Curated annotation (Swiss-Prot):
Quaternary organization: Part of the 50S ribosomal subunit.
GO cellular component, one term: cytosolic large ribosomal subunit
A biological process term (GO) from this entry: cytoplasmic translation
Membrane-traversing stretches: none
Keywords: Ribonucleoprotein, Ribosomal protein, RNA-binding, rRNA-binding
Gene name tied to this protein: rplF
Family under the similarity heading: Belongs to the universal ribosomal protein uL6 family.
Annotated function: This protein binds to the 23S rRNA, and is important in its secondary structure. It is located near the subunit interface in the base of the L7/L12 stalk, and near the tRNA binding site of the peptidyltransferase center.
PANTHER family assigned to the protein according to its UniProt record, in alphabetical order: 60S/50S RIBOSOMAL PROTEIN L6/L9, LARGE RIBOSOMAL SUBUNIT PROTEIN UL6M
Domain of life from the UniProt record: Bacteria
Lineage start: Bacteria, Bacillati, Chloroflexota, Chloroflexia, Chloroflexales
Pfam families: Ribosomal_L6
GO MF entries: rRNA binding; structural constituent of ribosome
InterPro entries for this protein: Ribosomal_uL6-like, Ribosomal_uL6-like_a/b-dom_sf, Ribosomal_uL6_a/b-dom, Ribosomal_uL6_bac-type
Descriptive protein name: Large ribosomal subunit protein uL6
Organism: Roseiflexus sp. (strain RS-1)
């Protein structure tokens, strides 16, 4: 049995879970509603405030789907109760971020500012720098873990951190492998 798949998912108070015949799971909580279609082969049950996922057989495909389905449902429950966030840091001379309404405006070394419109369910927050040599932080929040991660990856891809001075957009917990600059001329 899958170690991840066999773990039951506790449903906190204030969270409603509905499971249809076609295995569409809808989770409604204080932060919003998430709905996702799962493989009809998986056996998903909701009893006594606990969601359990079972598989019909032990073939490789069912073992893989078992843990995946359980993890995705657990992420949905966490998303509608606590939500998810990713923090990006913008480092570089003249690199900055600002909000215009819901949109995010980035100045990251291009000849023009880049405007990013958040998809539905995603919000941006820009924290002001406390000092000039501290990186500026952008927080991406939402209830769907996949959407939050995808939007963070798209923003990071606009200007990935370069290895010499570390300028660019990176995740807060990311470590950049730095390179030494070229050696000076010997006289």
């Amino acid at each position: 049995m899958s170690r991840i798949g066999k773990k039951p998912i506790p449903v906190p108070r204030g969270v409603e879970v509905t499971i249809t015949e076609e295995n569409r799971v809808t989770v409604k909580g204080p932060k919003g509603t998430l709905s996702q279609q799962f493989s009809p082969e998986m056996l998903i049950t909701h009893e006594n405030g606990v969601i359990t996922v079972a598989r019909p057989s032990d073939d490789k495909r069912h073992r893989a789907l078992h843990g995946l389905t359980r993890s995705l449902i657990a992420n949905m429950v966490t998303g509608v109760t606590e939500g998810y966030q990713r923090i990006l840091e913008i480092t570089g001379i003249g690199y900055r971020a600002a909000r215009e309404g819901k949109n995010l405006v980035l100045q990251v070394g291009f000849s023009h500012p880049i405007r990013v419109t958040p998809p539905e369910g995603i919000t941006f927050e820009v924290l002001e720098r406390r000092s000039a040599n501290e990186p500026q932080q952008v927080i991406i929040r939402g209830i769907d873990k996949q959407k939050v991660g995808e939007e963070a990856a798209k923003l990071r891809a606009l200007r990935p951190p370069e290895p010499y001075k570390g300028y660019g957009i990176k995740y807060r917990d990311e470590r950049i492998r730095r390179k030494a600059g070229k050696a000076g001329k010997a006289r």
